[in-house]
């Protein structure tokens, strides 16, 4: 009888531990979602990136080309302990798990291809309210 009770309580304890872990993971994602939202709100341009990613480098190069007065705020996910959690929160928010994810004035612009396309079409300059330099 004691062994049966021990197993039942052991299973209950394991279930409680699992539920607590799920709860802390969910609250971790919620806090990372708050981090993403507050970061996007606090800066004109935000790039969620990974330092080794060629697509991220391409998106960052677009903003260098524009010669903005204020550089984009870059969050290098691979250089943060909570980078995976932030990436999960981004995925929940924008429906994409890939990087980069670019935000301009609080609005999601997209990834690398979206950023380059917006730059080439002039849409990005309009979003940033800057004059486009014409090639001579």
UniProtKB/Swiss-Prot annotation:
<keyword id="KW-0963">Cytoplasm</keyword>
<comment type="similarity">
    <text>Belongs to the glutaredoxin family. CPYC subfamily.</text>
</comment>
<keyword id="KW-0249">Electron transport</keyword>
<keyword id="KW-1015">Disulfide bond</keyword>
<dbReference type="Pfam" id="PF00462">
    <property type="entry name" value="Glutaredoxin"/>
</dbReference>
<protein>
    <recommendedName>
        <fullName>Glutaredoxin-C8</fullName>
    </recommendedName>
</protein>
<dbReference type="GO" id="GO:0015038">
    <property type="term" value="F:glutathione disulfide oxidoreductase activity"/>
</dbReference>
<dbReference type="InterPro" id="IPR002109">
    <property type="entry name" value="Glutaredoxin"/>
</dbReference>
<feature type="domain" description="Glutaredoxin">
    <location>
        <begin position="33"/>
        <end position="135"/>
    </location>
</feature>
<dbReference type="InterPro" id="IPR036249">
    <property type="entry name" value="Thioredoxin-like_sf"/>
</dbReference>
<dbReference type="InterPro" id="IPR011899">
    <property type="entry name" value="Glutaredoxin_euk/vir"/>
</dbReference>
<dbReference type="GO" id="GO:0034599">
    <property type="term" value="P:cellular response to oxidative stress"/>
</dbReference>
<comment type="function">
    <text>Has a glutathione-disulfide oxidoreductase activity in the presence of NADPH and glutathione reductase. Reduces low molecular weight disulfides and proteins.</text>
</comment>
<feature type="disulfide bond" description="Redox-active">
    <location>
        <begin position="53"/>
        <end position="56"/>
    </location>
</feature>
<dbReference type="GO" id="GO:0005737">
    <property type="term" value="C:cytoplasm"/>
</dbReference>
<dbReference type="InterPro" id="IPR014025">
    <property type="entry name" value="Glutaredoxin_subgr"/>
</dbReference>
<keyword id="KW-0676">Redox-active center</keyword>
<dbReference type="InterPro" id="IPR011767">
    <property type="entry name" value="GLR_AS"/>
</dbReference>
<keyword id="KW-0813">Transport</keyword>
């Amino acid at each position: 009888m004691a062994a049966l009770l021990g197993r039942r309580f052991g299973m209950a304890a394991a279930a409680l531990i699992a539920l607590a872990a799920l709860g802390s993971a969910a609250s971790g994602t919620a806090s990372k979602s708050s981090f993403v939202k507050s970061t996007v709100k606090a800066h004109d341009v935000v790039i969620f990136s990974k330092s080794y990613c060629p697509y991220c480098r391409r998106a960052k190069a677009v903003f260098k080309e524009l010669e903005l007065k204020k550089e984009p705020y870059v969050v290098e996910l691979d250089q943060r302990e909570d980078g995976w959690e932030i990436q999960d929160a981004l995925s929940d928010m924008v429906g994409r798990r890939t990087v980069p994810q670019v935000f301009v004035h609080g609005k999601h612009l997209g990834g690398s291809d979206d950023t380059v396309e917006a730059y080439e079409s002039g849409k990005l300059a309009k979003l940033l309210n800057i004059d486009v330099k014409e090639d001579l």
